[in-house]
């Protein structure tokens, strides 16, 4: 864990008296198989008892983090603070700094029922879910008013920090690294959506994508996740929660939540990876504060796309490959939720881009390559045809 999380839209989730059980089969890295689990009402005690997690004592976590010393803080946000600590790899007992395995301990602010609900939801989902592109929750602590979560430590921090912070510690991410991160995050979402019933992540954003030492992307913070619709229902109805700039328009307008809401958020992050811009940035010129609204007209035109592309990526990519991702992002942010691709379809496209080498045909006739990209997209066909530079 590299940090806490940015401010969410300040509204409450619809109240519920239960959180459903998750008994998910372990899955491969592509996230394309179907996971199944039982579905039943569960109390807080049942959730904690059935989670595949260690129940840490407060004294153990104090020892692991050197009594939550200020210089152990690695992140801070609405949930509380995140501290760096160490535990023994075998026994999971506290160990001396620099020995054993590194952990991230997230301590809940001791106020508010919503924070407790999110803490419990995190245990309910990550206590049962297991996938290479989901951050690993090791354990929890519940003592009187103290509520903490213990995760694997994500050495590289968040995607948000690497994309938007400047300085010697955060070097610009290369094109290939960005594509690989997008693929990893897509696999994590696909795994959630392939569960029966589906799991809707609901807060997909750059700050919730954490990176290990090899820059592998993992989804974190399941406090807002919830089960998808059952039976013939197309959505679940909730009060709106999420992060400004990432939430799907139909969800903001109606509270109707589906897996296609996550797809929209994925499209926003794709645009952030392409542009190096935040989803919402009031420091940009007037008319460019909202990344989706500003970028949308440029995503199917080769010449115009250059205006969107992060200048730090110059010389690292072909415009044809960049256009494929831009068109994919355009499909994801479609106003019509039904026309957005599934995460399985997105994973397939991203895998092709990840392994694709520069094709000689692109150099010979780039217009043919671009036409093929445009014709395959239900959104791009409605935009002006690109011209060749």
From Swiss-Prot:
Q: Which CDD domains match?
A: STKc_IRAK
**What domain of life is recorded for the organism?**
Eukaryota
List the molecular function annotations (GO) for this entry: ATP binding; protein serine kinase activity; protein serine/threonine kinase activity
Q: How does it sit in the membrane?
A: Lipid-anchor
Catalytic residues, chain numbering: 203
Instruction: Write down the Gene3D superfamilies for this protein, in alphabetical order.
Output: Phosphorylase Kinase, domain 1 (3.30.200.20), Transferase(Phosphotransferase) domain 1 (1.10.510.10)
Q: Where is the Protein kinase domain?
A: 68-353
Q: Which of the residues bear the PTM Phosphoserine?
A: 207, 237
List-wise, which residues carry Phosphothreonine? 238, 243
Query: One Gene Ontology cellular component annotation?
Result: plasma membrane
Q: Tell me which residues bear the N-myristoyl glycine lipid modification.
A: 2
Q: Where in the cell is it found?
A: Cell membrane
> What InterPro entries does the annotation carry?
Kinase-like_dom_sf, Plant_Ser_Thr_Prot_Kinase, Prot_kinase_dom, Protein_kinase_ATP_BS, Ser-Thr/Tyr_kinase_cat_dom, Ser/Thr_kinase_AS
Residues where Phosphotyrosine is found: 151, 251
Give the top-level enzyme category: transferase
- Alphabetically list the UniProt keywords: ATP-binding, Cell membrane, Kinase, Lipoprotein, Membrane, Myristate, Nucleotide-binding, Palmitate, Phosphoprotein, Plant defense, Serine/threonine-protein kinase, Transferase
This chain's function reads: May play a role in the regulation of plant growth and development. May be involved in plant defense signaling.
Name the family the entry cites: Belongs to the protein kinase superfamily. Ser/Thr protein kinase family.
Q: What is this protein called?
A: Probable serine/threonine-protein kinase PBL11
Species, as recorded? Arabidopsis thaliana
- Write the lineage as a comma-separated list: Eukaryota, Viridiplantae, Streptophyta, Embryophyta, Tracheophyta
């Amino acid at each position: 864990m590299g940090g806490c999380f940015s401010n969410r839209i300040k509204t409450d989730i619809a109240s519920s008296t239960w959180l459903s059980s998750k008994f998910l089969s372990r899955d491969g890295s592509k996230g394309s198989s179907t996971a199944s689990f039982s579905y039943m009402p569960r109390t807080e005690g049942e959730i904690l008892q059935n989670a595949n997690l260690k129940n840490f004592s407060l004294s153990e976590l104090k020892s692991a983090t050197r009594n939550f010393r200020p210089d152990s803080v690695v992140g801070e946000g609405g949930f509380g603070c995140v501290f760096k600590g160490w535990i023994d790899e075998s026994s999971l007992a506290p160990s001396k700094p620099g020995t054993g395995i590194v952990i991230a301990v997230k301590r809940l602010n001791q106020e508010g029922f919503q924070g407790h609900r999110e803490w419990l939801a995190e245990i309910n989902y990550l206590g049962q879910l297991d996938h290479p592109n989901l951050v690993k929750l090791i354990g929890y602590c519940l003592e009187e008013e103290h509520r903490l979560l213990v995760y694997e430590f994500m050495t590289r921090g968040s995607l948000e920090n690497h994309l938007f912070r400047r300085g010697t510690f955060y070097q610009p991410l290369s094109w290939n690294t960005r594509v690989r991160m997008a693929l990893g995050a897509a696999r994590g979402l696909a795994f959630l959506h392939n569960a029966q019933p589906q799991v809707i992540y609901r807060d997909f954003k750059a700050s919730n994508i954490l990176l290990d030492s090899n820059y592998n992307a993992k989804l974190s913070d399941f406090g807002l996740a919830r089960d998808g619709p059952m039976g013939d229902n197309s959505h679940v109805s909730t009060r709106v929660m999420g992060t400004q700039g990432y939430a799907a328009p139909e969800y903001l307008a109606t509270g109707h939540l589906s897996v296609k809401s996550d797809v929209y958020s994925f499209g926003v992050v794709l645009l952030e990876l392409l542009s190096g811009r935040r989803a919402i940035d009031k420091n940009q010129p007037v008319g460019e504060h909202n990344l989706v609204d500003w970028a949308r007209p440029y995503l199917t035109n080769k010449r115009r796309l250059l205006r969107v592309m992060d200048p730090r990526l110059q010389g690292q990519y072909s415009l044809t490959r960049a256009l494929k991702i831009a068109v994919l992002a355009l499909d994801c942010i479609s106003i019509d939720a039904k026309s957005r691709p599934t995460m399985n379809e997105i994973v397939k496209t991203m895998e092709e881009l990840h392994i694709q080498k520069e094709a000689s045909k692109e150099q010979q006739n780039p217009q043919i390559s671009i036409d093929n990209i445009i014709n395959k997209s239900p959104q791009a066909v409605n935009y002006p045809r690109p011209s060749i530079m």
